[in-house]
């Protein structure tokens, strides 16, 4: 339980964040789908994620009752292209394709707070920070 309450944030170079919900419409409603079906879909969803173990770390925050979205998904990796690959593959699984609602996706470079000023300085370029 402690790991869920206080997740360790990995020291990767890139992060991705997006909010998400499960659909509650008249035609498709995640919460009225029988629990065994939801469990099967989430197991299949998790199997896709496990293929990325070791390259992507995921931290899910529950925000039901605190925000307009039910969850916040944080992904951490040293290669930002892996986010695209993972998200692309997951969009075709049943849980995401039929029931997932996604907000805006944000991808960024992590940097120490002490470097923020130089990143925002005129004349600075990504190359001056080691990016090609």
Across the structure, where does each feature detected by a protein language model lie?
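Generic "edge-of-domain/loop-turn" microfeature
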Residues: 25, 80-82, 111-112
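Short, glycine- and small/hydrophobic-rich beta-strand elements in well-ordered beta-sheets
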Residues: 44-70, 86, 97-112
């Amino acid at each position: 339980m402690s790991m869920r309450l206080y997740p360790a944030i990995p020291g990767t170079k890139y992060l991705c964040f997006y909010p998400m919900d499960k659909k509650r419409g008249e035609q498709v409603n995640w919460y009225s789908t029988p629990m065994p079906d939801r469990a099967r879909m989430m197991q299949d969803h998790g199997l896709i994620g496990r293929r990325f173990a070791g390259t992507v770390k995921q931290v899910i925050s529950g925000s039901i009752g605190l925000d307009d979205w039910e969850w916040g998904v944080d992904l951490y990796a040293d290669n930002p292209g892996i986010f695209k690959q993972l998200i692309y593959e997951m969009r075709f699984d049943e849980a995401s394709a039929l029931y997932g609602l996604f907000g805006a996706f944000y991808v960024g470079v992590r940097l120490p707070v002490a470097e923020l000023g130089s990143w925002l300085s005129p004349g600075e370029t990504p190359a001056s920070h080691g990016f090609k």
